[in-house]
Amino acid sequence: RGLGDVYKRQHIASVGTVEDKLFNPVDISDELLERLSTEKFCLIDESAEVPMRELIEDCRMSQDSIGGVVECAIKGVPVGIGSPMFDGVENVIASMIFGVPAVKGIEFGSGFEGSKHKGSENNDPFVYDGDTIKTETNNHGGILGGITSGMPIIFRAAIKPTASISQKQNTVNLETHENTELEIKGRHDPCIVVRAVPVIENATAIAILDLMMDKYTILSLIHIS
């Protein structure tokens, strides 16, 4: 959904070990974003849907659950949004995303994979594209030093497996101080990754709007003074 000229979309990057393709961090087409906005099971590579659904069903039948990853791409955020310290773009987005239940981790750009590379491999060279300055690659995920670079903002959020499963689990009895077993009754989602996509999408929208309002409020105050 749009925030002015800002657009963001999420997709299911993985369910368990079944993976979808990731966003091209440099070139994300409007057509892809539009297609993802109309789908209930949001995938870049639609052929991943069947094995993902089969894995979820297997977990349901075995009274278990499975986690996964949601990837988000944000286009059109102006250059210079954010702060180099505590109000950086990563800080604000992460704070909002960690408010979503079951989120256990977040990475931006090349993330943890980038930690395996040399600086010469992970750095993003700047180039002119007409009158616009861009980077050839986007390992920084659209954020440098807490401030937007104008490239697409890319992050991935890890969703843990649903804790409420119908299998017997070891626990403790607080009254008797003894070890015991817990058996949960009722209906529980075997995978909440699919449900998490629109939640993370809207949490992201709030974070980006908050960042942009801060930026333009400061500019307005400077202009008034």
Regions inferred by a protein language model and the residue ranges of each:
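Internal helix-turn-beta structural module
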Residues: 154, 162-221
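Short, small-residue-biased leader/transition segments that mark boundaries at the very start
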Residues: 2-7, 223
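Hydrophobic alpha-helical scaffolding
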Residues: 38, 42-46, 79-87, 96, ...
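Glycine-rich anion/phosphate-binding loop at the beta-strand->alpha-helix junction
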Residues: 62-179
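A structural signal for short, well-ordered beta-strand segments
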Residues: 10-12, 72-74, 155-157, 204, ...
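Active-site helix-to-loop segments that bind/position phosphate- or nucleotide-bearing substrates
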Residues: 5-74
